[in-house]
């Protein structure tokens, strides 16, 4: 078995290299002697004495004694864990174990002796020493001791450090013994010659640094392995954890390998014993400061996020309280200042955004989310937002990271998606907790306050021109783009329901005060008093807050009363009455506490309403007022054409326009932003001018501006808004807004260019108009034309009122009447019909239950057709051929007697082949002839479900048979043409029957020769048409 892939051999008595090393890995503790002697040393000493006394006999017995000693040593090692208490580990073999390639495999296979050896505290301490080695932690040392490369030799770098070391080692060894040196040189020379013959590349010996790095990696793999005994042994010895966590005390930057080892080991311990690990982590001093020293290290910051994720609402661990007491959020915001490097700023910003995502308020996010907490509440507090805004105004990377944090806060803490809306809660029904959803009132108010500063930064930022293939352009820059993105997101935030509720701000402040008091009393032992005092400093007007609290408490008590009290006594009902009495005043005051929206056809956008909203603005309106005062929205809109190639900016501008045109019109300040967009900014004129500029530019250069796609989207928003106000019959008090829609140039643009563009956008990809029609349309149209064509030879056509029905047979509505089932005639006899209006017409395949009254007419044709149809079925059961010329002699009379308006070549549910010769030819036949395939008695399909494929001899698919005449409105109309309905039906049927006879006879003559040639193939072949099983017959 020399070529077998099994590398362990077939002899089970052969030990693995790891097991051989482990045989000498335990030293027995001898209490009688002062010195500890490894197992087997006594026997070796005795043997040595005997060898010294009798040299002649020793030469022949050395090998036998050594083998016996190894077996005895193996047998003397204990087999239970308790017996190893009398042994201590031999640390000299640890390096040999780490150098073995199969060590980790043996560990995963639960090698008993290996587990016992690795569980010793001395061994674990040595492994941690490998991981925390200064050579591993010191990145400069690693880089300084790298092999030198001779400059100027690019193709073949020469390694000179190893050569020098080899020379030194050879020189030192050369002074010991010449014979040993010569032998070793000779052996090494032979080995090198063999290696050179086998391969052209020889691996140099590992350096000391490489060996230590490899051993540190293996040690980290062992410590982080999914082996419970090792993890438990580490957790039992806190000193080992302390030495491991000393990595955080190393000055920055910390090498990535060392931080990776730290993260892997601690994550394993955290998963194994979360309680003990968190107890150790929270007991560490300056936890936040030690982690923020390495804020640039992603592995350490990811581990900190995992520690934070353990503090869930249903099982709190106290991590968030400890981190808040150590001021994690303020220190992270400090790292966003330009005083730190760009990488440090970006790392701090990324950590804050990841933490906000982890603390999302949405229940549809990842299961690992911890929900709102005190850290995120501190982040959106007035003090922290003010600090963040000042950092953002410094520009550069600070602005970019700050905008990213604000956007993440708004998107992950939308109050509209709260499980319980804040305005519907009370202190009694929902006492405030540290896990309450956070609100963004302070955020919106402070950004409205500093909006002029951001507007100045947007206007003053200028960048040098850039050379492009089509000319020099001015780049937008990250600062201006981030400001535009910030404005769009703040506009989203200002439309939240909580920020537009009159009592929303008061309720939020009341709950914040109550929550701060509870935290202050419950966390005195945890030194949270200072932070609570800082939080309480946000509210300066204590008297006003007490009055608000008392008033809201009375209002909430009244809300908890009976329904009669709610309707008569509460302040909300009184506000609703005020809304009905004075619509204009309430509309200006945002309908006070009720939020009732009045559906008035006139939109109040007068100056009096504007001033009324400015006197007592809500939080959401305060931001919109700041946007209007700074004219920042108009400045952003002008940038649409100034930067025609920046699609990111165009997308943001479209987002702003979409919010304005879809915002509330009857409440809030949004109507005035709309007026500024249409009247002051003259948006319609800008769109038309931009489209014309693009056309002129295209004529000169052959290129179109990059904003045309978003320009069309903005124009579509204006058109939809115009349709909305027309449909709702809304009018503006100020007619300037309505006049913009009635200007000639805008009407011409919307009716021509915009309409054509809309039609192109709405076209299905790959649709070529009316050039191609679907198969169903072709069949339906051909059927309708043939049916109308049949009426041309009908003598009853043109007699009067029923001509319109026949002439309009191609119309879709009349065709539906033609194909649908009619219940107007013989309702008592139509229960037995199983008829469908589409292709799967059951009467086409076979008659489930035929109505006897339809076949008992005086002419007798229906009954004869049924009898012939039954004969065809019986022939199929006897295994006749698929095509029979004898049956075709009377085929025309048999097939056309069922109805007069269903010619076989125009049957509505199945189209005929274009070549008449293919109609009676079975193209689905086997290449070889099979005997007995037509005999039903030879084979019975056990899986036949009644829908199996048809077999040869089935007459249903040689020539399509028409079902009995359906009861439709068309037939009823034809019957009403004459008082004698039966005679007219016979006459009409005869005219069409003659036509069918001629067509079928012509098809038979054309295909007669071809059928004779393929008679054998058709007789023995299979058809892919579906039919009922023979049990149905």
UniProtKB/Swiss-Prot annotation:
Protein task: Positive regulator of protein phosphatase SIT4. Involved in the general amino acid control (GAAC) response regulated by TOR. Involved in the dephosphorylation of the elongator complex subunit IKI3.
PANTHER family: FIERY MOUNTAIN, ISOFORM D (PTHR12634:SF8), SIT4 YEAST -ASSOCIATING PROTEIN-RELATED (PTHR12634)
Region (Disordered): 32-82, 147-213, 768-813, 828-1033
InterPro entries: SAPS (IPR007587)
GO cellular component: cytosol; nucleus
Localization annotation: Cytoplasm
Modified residues (Phosphothreonine): 990
Chief site of localization: cytoplasm
Biased composition (Basic and acidic residues): 158-170, 183-195, 858-879
Subunit structure: Associates with the SIT4 protein phosphatase catalytic subunit in a cell-cycle-dependent manner.
Composition bias type Polar residues, residue spans: 909-924
Taxonomy of the source species: Eukaryota, Fungi, Dikarya, Ascomycota, Saccharomycotina
Biased composition annotated in UniProt, kind: Acidic residues: 171-182, 784-793, 828-838, 932-944, 1000-1018
Entry protein name: SIT4-associating protein SAP190
Superkingdom as given in the UniProt entry: Eukaryota
Family membership: Belongs to the SAPS family.
Record's comment on post-translational modification: Hyperphosphorylated in the absence of SIT4.
Transmembrane segments: none
A GO molecular-function descriptor: protein phosphatase regulator activity
Keywords of this entry: Cell cycle, Cytoplasm, Phosphoprotein
Annotated positions of the Phosphoserine modification: 774, 857, 862, 892, 991
Pfam families: SAPS
This protein's encoding gene: SAP190
